[in-house]
């Protein structure tokens, strides 16, 4: 029959409602039609059945509804006729039941296991009050323990069923609007109801635990402090419930009751976690109020005070719980005065970002960029910073805290409203994902899983909008909400600061006081908060468009800069750069319209002194901070192409000074490009060294060409050919930012020209080149060092090829032969340069190898260098050049092996340390493991040495001690975090191991 106890008069065929097809109902199960017929829902065309079918089609997953309905039909305990009749006539029941079955497989299984629970969803259903919840749970265990034969766990199944029934009712009311025209429950109401259910459940768990442990004895006084989302009454459907126990006496009996309570609750309801207690899982489970006070006064970290923001006395002895809160909450609001508060907050901010594995970062609702943790962490931090002086911020829930921050002027009211809306949307999705299987999760479906995305959209009551289907609308909404949270996250911290110092046109009309602004800046990592405020004030109070644009930009820029190792230095550099480029309209427009450029620039400014100084005079490099079609624009310029452009540009000038100025200009731009790419992790250290060598070589060539042009009248022929031989790291193409250029000059008289005349002219040219390049300027210095030439400073600056050959054959010391190992022709006459190298080969790679006496002399010299050349006061463990396992150790070791074996192994005829190490490994001269030790030490020391120049802006070889500067060096060297101590430990470990092998080669 069509409807129970209802006489149905069939309409004529022309008046019957059209029964929708299985496909139109959104049913994809191949047995769907069969199951509909089994239930009797597909046999009639009357309005009741058609309405029921359309209700089914609106469920988030109609197939997921149908499967448990068939199981209920088949279960005699269901009372199918009663249920079916109710579904046909009770639209509210239909909406609630179909919505919950289409959204939660787990609650569907619960309903099948307890088929009479469907009756909880019919009629006028409302959420039970806190009192009703406590009564229901109390009644469930009212007679527990009356019978001495009761097993301790006999009550658990009843409690589990009751708890799931409460979730069923709440979820059904929460979801009903997805199927029928039912009221939408606000997120805050759902989260608070979940917390109320947890309160009642935990109170019952405590009662059961007391009965199991104490029997008829008086139980100990025990308070259960709710923490986390439970404490804030913003609980998820599936959460670990965080607790702290406080006892009148922290004795074994109290501990047993607490342990038993956790066990009962975990088995009947949800996972209970006491990990937020003092000392975490290693600490005592139960403490007295006095013990808690002592711990928080002496040992607690900032994150532990942050966790207490959510503390609430929820279960057990109320007086004891309130005493605990009264004692500890004043410490929470004073936490920002602690000496290590800023450092710990910075560490927490970075830890939040590092928690998410890269492969799921885009799917993370909680920990991803623009996710829930961004909101929660920001809100809690602002509460900690300002709650000391403003009791209106002493609230536990995130939504209430956002409202209080808006009312107090700590964030804009509109921003607070927008952030609340985004937060509630993301929490709604989190709830829907957890409901599906009653599992703790905050991972969105994989983007390619269209079915899962569509289900989530429908469960979240998202419908097609004409341009996209429900899944497409969800994707767009997620993107928009994440973006809004990311943008507001920065604005949250910094916009009110601008109001406290900026013009009245800014959006917040009642910004925080200057004292509060300084306090907040200090918390965010700005050590000189007063000075920082002055810089910010100077930027936003500029007249006209510039000040307005800075007011818009600064919240985001300051936030990004706060993650850099030196925010104070970065802010000063940003102010100087902005003032220097005040006439350039593209500058602020680029930062406004291209967030990737702005973010990278803030990192560079907050890490380096060297690069910002270059950007002042080569600002066009900033425009290369973005990405092109082929990747980062900073990598588009090839070093060889830059070198050719530099030589060509300098060649346009007849005046050597102007030519050198042109060369400096292009070098400046190239140094800014390479330094920026290095700081942003876009270049390997070997690529950096080659690029720096390339530009140095180009400058040498440009300078030599310019001076020769100036000293040759038009049409005259040069009296000599000149070649520049690169030595040291220049010859090995391994220059760093602070390296000078070790060179030697060689000449060859032109036909018919006397040696004396050629040498006089060549010496004048070489001296002029060196003097021009050494001329002081605002750019990094161009120091040319020719002291490796024969006889050093006492010898002539230029020699003929024959004179070099004679000197090396007759007078050269072992160290001079060693220096030739890195000789390479870099500029000037290429043919002459190659002939010099052929001559040098006979000296550095003699047919029978170097003598044993020469090897002993080199070892003695190495010992003398270690004893005498290390600067006074330098730490030998952390001196990157001359320290233990530093650059000199590795290079001398490699060169000694070249001297001993290169006559037999042409592969060792290399000027590069790294290439020589590769050849040593290939020839099996030493074990590969030892080669790797040397290689890693050289790379580590080179990165550190380069980073020192980038950070300090001047040449230095000594790593600083622990502190902000060491942190900056770590970041500049490519260390994965800004923990300078970790970086230093790694440096010491790598260089110590390398030094062990170096001692084997040279002797201790």
From Swiss-Prot:
Biological processes per GO annotation: regulation of glutamine family amino acid metabolic process
EC main group: transferase
Function statement: Involved in the regulation of glutamine synthetase GlnA, a key enzyme in the process to assimilate ammonia. When cellular nitrogen levels are high, the C-terminal adenylyl transferase (AT) inactivates GlnA by covalent transfer of an adenylyl group from ATP to specific tyrosine residue of GlnA, thus reducing its activity. Conversely, when nitrogen levels are low, the N-terminal adenylyl removase (AR) activates GlnA by removing the adenylyl group by phosphorolysis, increasing its activity.
Organism listed in the record: Mycobacterium leprae (strain TN)
Reaction catalysed by this enzyme: [glutamine synthetase]-O(4)-(5'-adenylyl)-L-tyrosine + phosphate = [glutamine synthetase]-L-tyrosine + ADP; [glutamine synthetase]-L-tyrosine + ATP = [glutamine synthetase]-O(4)-(5'-adenylyl)-L-tyrosine + diphosphate
Any GO molecular function: [glutamate-ammonia-ligase] adenylyltransferase activity
Adenylyl removase: annotated span: 1-497
Keywords: ATP-binding, Magnesium, Multifunctional enzyme, Nucleotide-binding, Nucleotidyltransferase, Transferase
Protein name per Swiss-Prot or TrEMBL: Bifunctional glutamine synthetase adenylyltransferase/adenylyl-removing enzyme
Pfam family, one: GlnD_UR_UTase
Protein's UniProt keywords contain Transferase: yes
Enzyme Commission code: 2.7.7.89, 2.7.7.42
InterPro entries according to UniProt: GlnE, GlnE_rpt_dom, NT_sf, PII_UdlTrfase/GS_AdlTrfase
Cofactor(s) annotated in UniProt: Mg(2+)
GO CC annotation terms, alphabetical: cytosol
Gene3D superfamilies assigned: Beta Polymerase, domain 2, Nucleotidyltransferases domain 2
């Amino acid at each position: 029959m069509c409807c129970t106890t209802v006489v149905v008069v069939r309409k004529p065929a022309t008046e019957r409602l059209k029964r929708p097809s299985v496909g139109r109902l959104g049913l994809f199960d191949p047995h769907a039609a069969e199951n509909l017929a089994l239930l009797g829902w597909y046999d009639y065309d009357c309005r009741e059945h058609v309405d029921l079918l359309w209700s089914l089609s609106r469920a988030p997953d109609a197939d997921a509804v149908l499967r448990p309905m068939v199981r209920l039909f088949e279960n005699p305990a269901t009372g199918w006729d009663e249920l079916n009749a109710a579904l046909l006539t009770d639209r509210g029941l239909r909406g609630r039941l179909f919505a919950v079955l289409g959204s939660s497989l787990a609650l569907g299984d619960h309903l099948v296991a307890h088929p009479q629970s469907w009756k909880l969803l019919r009629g006028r259903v409302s959420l039970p009050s806190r009192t009703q919840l406590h009564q229901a749970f109390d009644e469930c265990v009212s007679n527990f323990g009356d019978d001495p034969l009761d097993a301790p766990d006999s009550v658990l199944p009843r409690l589990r069923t009751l708890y799931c029934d409460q979730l069923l009712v709440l979820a059904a009311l929460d979801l009903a609007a997805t199927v029928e025209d039912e009221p939408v429950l606000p997120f805050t109401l759902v989260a608070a109801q979940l917390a109320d259910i947890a309160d009642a459940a935990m109170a019952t768990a405590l009662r059961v635990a007391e009965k199991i442990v104490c029997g008829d004895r008086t139980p100990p006084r025990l308070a259960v402090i709710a923490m986390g989302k439970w404490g804030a009454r913003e609980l998820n459907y599936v959460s670990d419930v965080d607790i702290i126990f406080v006892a009148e006496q922290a004795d074994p009996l109290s501990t047993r009751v607490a342990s038993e309570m956790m066990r009962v609750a975990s088995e009947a309801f949800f996972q209970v976690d006491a990990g937020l207690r003092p000392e975490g899982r290693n600490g005592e489970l139960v403490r007295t109020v006095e013990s808690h006070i002592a711990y928080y006064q002496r040992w607690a970290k900032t994150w532990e005070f942050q966790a207490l923001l959510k503390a609430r006395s929820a279960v057990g002895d109320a007086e004891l719980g309130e005493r605990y809160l009264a004692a500890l909450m004043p410490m929470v609001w004073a936490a920002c005065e602690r000496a290590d508060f800023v450092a710990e907050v910075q560490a927490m901010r970075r830890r939040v970002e590092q928690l998410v594995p890269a492969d799921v970062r885009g799917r993370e609702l909680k920990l991803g960029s623009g996710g829930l943790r961004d909101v929660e962490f920001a809100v809690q931090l602002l509460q900690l910073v300002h709650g000391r002086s403003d009791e209106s911020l002493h609230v536990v829930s995130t939504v209430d805290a956002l409202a209080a921050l808006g009312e107090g002027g700590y964030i804009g009211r509109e921003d607070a409203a927008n952030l609340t809306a985004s937060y509630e949307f993301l929490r709604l999705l989190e709830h829907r994902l957890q409901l599906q299987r009653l599992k703790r999760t905050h991972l969105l479906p994989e983007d390619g899983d269209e079915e899962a995305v569509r289900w989530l959209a429908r469960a979240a009551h998202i419908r097609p909008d004409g341009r996209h289907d429900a899944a497409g609308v969800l994707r767009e909404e997620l993107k928009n909400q994440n973006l809004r949270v990311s943008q507001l996250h920065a604005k949250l911290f910094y916009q009110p600061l601008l109001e406290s110092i900026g013009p009245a046109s800014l959006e917040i009309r009642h910004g925080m006081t200057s004292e509060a602004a300084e306090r907040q800046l200090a918390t965010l990592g700005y050590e000189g908060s007063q000075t920082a405020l002055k810089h910010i004030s100077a930027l936003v109070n500029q007249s006209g468009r510039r000040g307005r644009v800075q007011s818009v930009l600064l919240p985001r820029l300051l936030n990004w800069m706060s993650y850099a190792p030196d925010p104070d230095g970065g802010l000063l550099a940003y102010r100087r750069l902005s003032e220097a480029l005040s006439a350039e309209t593209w500058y602020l427009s680029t930062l406004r319209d291209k967030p990737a450029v702005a973010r990278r620039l803030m990192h560079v400014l907050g890490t380096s002194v060297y690069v910002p100084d270059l950007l002042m005079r080569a600002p066009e490099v900033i425009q290369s901070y973005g990405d092109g079609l082929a990747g980062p624009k900073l990598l588009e310029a090839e070093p060889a192409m830059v070198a050719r452009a530099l030589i060509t540009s300098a060649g346009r000038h007849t005046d050597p000074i102007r030519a050198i100025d042109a060369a400096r200009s292009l070098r400046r731009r190239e140094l800014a490009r390479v330094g920026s790419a290095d700081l942003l992790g876009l270049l390997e250290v070997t690529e950096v060294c080659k690029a720096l060598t390339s530009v140095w070589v180009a400058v040498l060539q440009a300078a030599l060409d310019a001076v020769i042009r100036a000293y040759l009248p038009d049409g005259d022929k040069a009296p000599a050919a000149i070649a520049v031989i690169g030595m040291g790291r220049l010859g090995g193409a391994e220059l760093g930012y602070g390296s000078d250029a070790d060179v030697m000059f060689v000449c060859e008289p032109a036909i018919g020209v006397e040696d004396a005349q050629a040498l006089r002219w060549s010496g004048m040219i070489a001296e002029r080149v060196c003097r021009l390049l050494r001329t002081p300027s605002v750019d990094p210095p161009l120091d040319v060092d020719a002291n490796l030439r024969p006889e050093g400073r006492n010898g002539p600056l230029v020699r003929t090829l024959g004179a070099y050959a004679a000197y090396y054959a007759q007078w050269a010391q072992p160290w001079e032969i060693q220096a030739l190992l890195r000789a390479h022709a870099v500029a000037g006459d290429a043919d002459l340069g190659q002939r010099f190298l052929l001559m040098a080969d006979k000296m550095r790679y003699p047919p029978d190898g170097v003598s044993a006496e020469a090897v002993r002399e080199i070892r003695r010299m190495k010992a003398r260098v270690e004893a005498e050349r290390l600067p006074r006061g330098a730490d030998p463990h952390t001196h990157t050049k001359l320290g233990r396992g530093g650059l000199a150790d590795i290079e001398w070791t490699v060169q000694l092996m070249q001297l001993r074996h290169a006559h037999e192994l042409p592969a060792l005829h290399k000027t590069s340390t790294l290439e020589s190490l590769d050849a040593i490994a290939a020839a099996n001269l030493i074990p590969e493991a030892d080669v790797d030790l040397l290689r890693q030490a050289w790379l580590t020391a080179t990165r550190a040495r380069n980073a020192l120049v980038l950070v300090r802006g001047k040449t230095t070889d000594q790593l600083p001690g622990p502190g902000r500067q060491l942190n900056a060096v770590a970041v500049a060297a490519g260390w994965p975090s800004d923990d300078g101590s970790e970086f230093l430990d790694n440096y010491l470990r790598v260089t110590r191991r390398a030094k062990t092998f170096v001692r084997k080669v040279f002797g201790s």
